[in-house]
């Protein structure tokens, strides 16, 4: 099957998901991050040279994904339908573009291009808030504060500083995942190295968010030290540190896996 034939077949089977994504983009429902990830995804597919031009696309797996997409469309589950459709596209493109069954970094970009943020907040928000509060406690105790964790809050004396939903770190996690995917594509990380990078990125985000929570607590409880108390400014500063750590970690993975293929076959 030629690449053009596979693409036309995918468009014919995924027209409802394509229209749904286009409607979100044109009506302003899509966030800027989703559009950025989608643009990066298309750019990767367009610019990547065919590593194995004679490789056959994963037609069976892609067909199953498209069947799931059709079922989800029938049940009026547009996000699941779109996720299945882009999974099928990645399965069709990966063998020839990257020489593997499924190129995980590109697949990750495709998932980030969808409206997954509310679902990440729903499923991961509370666990991340718990982890943030738990890790912030020893940081603050080391700074001399008698702090204890109270659920997702930091208790000091009679007051509690809550780690609420906006401070869960979900947006930082999304941005870190985008950065990881871009770096992994550029460095041609293998599947195992990318999986290790994902675990390391998650750990760095949790630690970075705990540092942000501790800094905000310190800024509110000890304003005389002049620490910047703006949530946005502190968030940007901590994310810059976290992003730098992710870049260093990916560089280490690249050096360790320099001779690996773009992904495991």
List the model feature ranges, each with a label.
Residues 20-28, 70-82, 95-99, 119-123, ...:
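Membrane-interface helix caps and helix-loop-helix hairpins in membrane proteins
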Residues 6, 10-11, 120-160:
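Extracytosolic (periplasmic/ER-lumenal) interhelical loops and adjacent juxtamembrane/interface segments
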Residues 35-47, 84-97, 102, 106, ...:
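Hydrophobic cores of alpha-helical transmembrane segments in multi-pass inner/ER membrane proteins
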Residues 24-31, 159-178, 182:
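A loop-to-helix transmembrane entry motif
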Residues 53-63, 79-87, 99-113, 127-131, ...:
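Cytoplasmic-side transmembrane-helix entry/capping segments in multi-pass membrane proteins
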Residues 29-30, 161-162, 168, 196-200, ...:
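Membrane-interface transmembrane-helix boundary segments in multi-pass integral membrane proteins
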Residues 72-78, 85-99, 106, 168-224:
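Active-site beta-strand/loop microenvironment that shapes enzyme catalytic pockets
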Residues 1-28, 37-54, 260-265:
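N- or domain-start disorder-to-order transition segments that initiate the globular core
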